Amino acid sequence: MKVNKVVQIHKGSNSVGGVFIYEESITGTVVKVNKKSIRVHMTHAKCTTNGRVTREYDINETATFDFWKTINRQFGENAGKTVDIYKNSKYGIIEVVH
């Protein structure tokens, strides 16, 4: 992970079938990298409900995301890759591919 790298932060709730009912995607830039956490300056957010964009807005906030765990992703855009997951209780999670 490098400083000034653009990252996507994801947060949402899903239904029984695993399809997201509500999802929020935030775009941000990494400001600081430590061994067990990263600090991200967030600039833009997009909210979707049932696949439709319901709200899009600009934000100007900085938050720290703590290292949670390393996993081998089985599905999604990072399928077959090892990723580190950082999380923040208010904003969601960031996946960083090795």
Give the predicted meaning of each segment.
Residues 45-98:
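Intrinsically disordered, low-complexity, charged/polar segments
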Residues 12, 39, 59-62:
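Enrichment for repetitive, rod-forming helical segments
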Residues 21-23, 91:
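Glycine-centered tight beta-turn/hairpin loop motif at sheet-sheet or coil-to-beta transitions
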Residues 1-21:
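Short coil-to-beta transition motif at edge beta-strands of beta-rich domains
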Residues 24, 29-53:
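Basic/aromatic-rich interaction segments and small domains that mediate binding to polyanionic partners
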